[in-house]
């Protein structure tokens, strides 16, 4: 695998577990974010167990397990307790990464930090992009939560919105020693999904061509591969 391909994380958004192996072993990427909240059977134990069997595939990519709640425009409609239990079972099944929202209390975050999985703490703003100071305060808050990687995604309405978000990557590294993924969603923010890699983000999120995007503005796997080749990354 080339360095450029290792920077690409494919987002698996699918109601069915059929053909899961093809996406977990998809060529030309380095990771898969599995949006388990999109699964039709996520609210039942058997449905989740059937899906998690895919984590036993020997040749799969590392997986970032995500069960996004409705409050962050995710598909999980059960109780918060049930959602956390689903995440715990996903870690026990062998997911290498777990994505957790930054509004979770410490007593929920702590067991995940102590688990075998690495933790992404994420913050999403689907309404817009705050000013620079509130964004930096948000990074400061995320950095206190003990994650391996911080993630901030806001919705861009102007080109300048992207610049404020992208500057969080070197800011977080310099101030807190934190690896940070920071980009903007939406049509105006699309280019930041490439630029964040050039600024030092460890990976960026793309969609599989056959599947829906997990957030507005995502490139396909092939599009991001081409863009990385054009700019000479990796």
Curated annotation (Swiss-Prot):
UniProt key word Lyase: yes
Q: What is this protein called?
A: 3-dehydroquinate dehydratase
Query: EC number(s) per UniProt?
Result: 4.2.1.10
The catalytic site is made up of 124 (proton donor/acceptor), 151 (schiff-base intermediate with substrate)
One GO molecular-function annotation for this sequence?
Answer: 3-dehydroquinate dehydratase activity
Q: Which UniProt keywords apply?
A: Amino-acid biosynthesis, Aromatic amino acid biosynthesis, Lyase, Schiff base
Task: Give the metabolic or biological pathway.
Answer: Metabolic intermediate biosynthesis; chorismate biosynthesis; chorismate from D-erythrose 4-phosphate and phosphoenolpyruvate: step 3/7
What's the short name of a Pfam family annotated to this entry? DHquinase_I
Q: What does this protein do?
A: Involved in the third step of the chorismate pathway, which leads to the biosynthesis of aromatic amino acids. Catalyzes the cis-dehydration of 3-dehydroquinate (DHQ) and introduces the first double bond of the aromatic ring to yield 3-dehydroshikimate.
For the keyword Translocase, the answer is no
- Please list the reactions this protein catalyses: 3-dehydroquinate = 3-dehydroshikimate + H2O
Q: Where does 3-dehydroquinate bind?
A: 33-35, 68, 193, 214, 218
Query: What are its GO biological-process terms?
Result: 3,4-dihydroxybenzoate biosynthetic process; amino acid biosynthetic process; aromatic amino acid family biosynthetic process; chorismate biosynthetic process
Q: How does it assemble?
A: Homodimer.
């Amino acid at each position: 695998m080339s360095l450029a391909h290792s920077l690409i994380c494919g987002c698996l958004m699918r109601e069915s577990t059929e053909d899961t192996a093809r996406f977990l072993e998809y060529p030309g990427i380095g990771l898969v974010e599995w949006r388990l909240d999109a699964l039709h059977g996520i609210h039942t134990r058997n449905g989740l167990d059937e899906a998690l069997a895919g984590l036993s595939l020997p040749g799969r990519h590392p997986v970032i397990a995500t069960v996004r709640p409705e409050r962050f425009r995710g598909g999980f409609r059960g109780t918060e307790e049930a959602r956390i239990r689903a995440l715990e079972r996903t870690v026990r099944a062998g997911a290498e990464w777990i994505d957790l929202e930054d509004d979770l209390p410490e007593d929920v975050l702590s067991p995940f930090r102590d688990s075998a999985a690495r933790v992404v703490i994420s913050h999403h703003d689907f309404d817009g992009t705050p000013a620079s100071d509130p964004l930096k305060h948000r990074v400061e808050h995320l950095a206190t939560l003990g994650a391996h990687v911080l993630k901030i995604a806001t919705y861009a309405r102007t080109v300048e919105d992207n610049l404020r978000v992208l500057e969080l990557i070197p800011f977080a590294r310099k101030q807190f020693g934190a690896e940070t993924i920071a980009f903007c969603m939406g049509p105006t923010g699309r280019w930041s999904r490439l630029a964040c890699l050039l600024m030092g983000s460890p990976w960026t999120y793309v969609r599989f061509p056959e599947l829906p995007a997990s957030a507005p503005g995502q490139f396909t796997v092939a599009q991001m591969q081409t863009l990385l080749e054009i700019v000479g990354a990796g």
